[in-house]
Amino acid sequence: MTMQEMIFRLNDYWAAQGCAILQPYDVEVGAGTKHPSTALRVLGPNPWNVAYVQPSRRPADGRYTRNPQRSQRYYQYQVIMKPSPDNIVDLYMGSLDALGFDTAANDVRLVEDDWEDQAAGAGGVGWEVWMNGAEITQFTFFQQMGGLECNPVCAEITYGPERLCLILDKKSSFWTDLDWNETVTYRQAEFQLEMQHNVYNFEVASTDMLFRLFDMFEEESKRVIDTEVRWDPEQGILTTGPVISSLPVPPLTETGPMALVYPAFDLALKCSHVFNLLDARGAISVTQRATFINRVRGRVRACCLKHMEQFKEEVLVGKAS
């Protein structure tokens, strides 16, 4: 099966289960979890069912294409269902059947593997899904994001499309065996990008510049999340300017949080990516590592807290009644 067909089939399957098929986020992330449609939307009471492909960058995982199934940039297919359906495991097994796997004929195992992302203050209980001895999916019930409780708990399913294609076709290498479609190979689409970024990540990236960038992105994220914005009911917009209007201001549940959460979160993601580049360059000591992780987590948490403000009225009304 080609990568393209794999993605099309997953899109069709999860759309039929009620998921909106979204697009990849355009900021460097280390996993589909960091896409704001997961990282922010798993918080709060509102139902949220989405699926999307996300290119994921993990600079330290590069192997100059010498490893047939490991790279610094690869794809994840992410599914979020909130609240988690009671039959989510059956839905997942159905997705494997839709891809052409015979789950009854293959050795499919759910291996307990509780998940944690320290830099995002995120975690949950879950499993790795293994088929015939190879990991194909991470399955998580989110309990925390940004150090805040996820209520209701939502289900996250993260597929590795490249590996699924190889297993389905009984092949072994991204770089020699995998096709993107009928006319373009995975190697043609990804090889030069992968090789050149490996050289940059491990040999060329300026650590002095990266340390400065981390500080700059961190400070800008702090400044942006603390910037006062107001809702202008006349114009129907958020603004930093004065608002003079006789129209009532809608509740926060309609206008969203009165803060620039998404721009501040983008900057937090940039901090995370810069940290990962520094880690690949070997510029982060063991003692520094915890400090940098805490700094990234602080930025993510600040964004999550502001995002949650839109639900305060709802919570207070519920308590009053």
Task: Give residue ranges: language-model regions.
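Structured aminoacyl-transfer and RNA-binding surfaces used for tRNA recognition/handling
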Residues: M1-V315
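Terminal leader/tail segments of proteins
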Residues: V315-L316, A320-S321
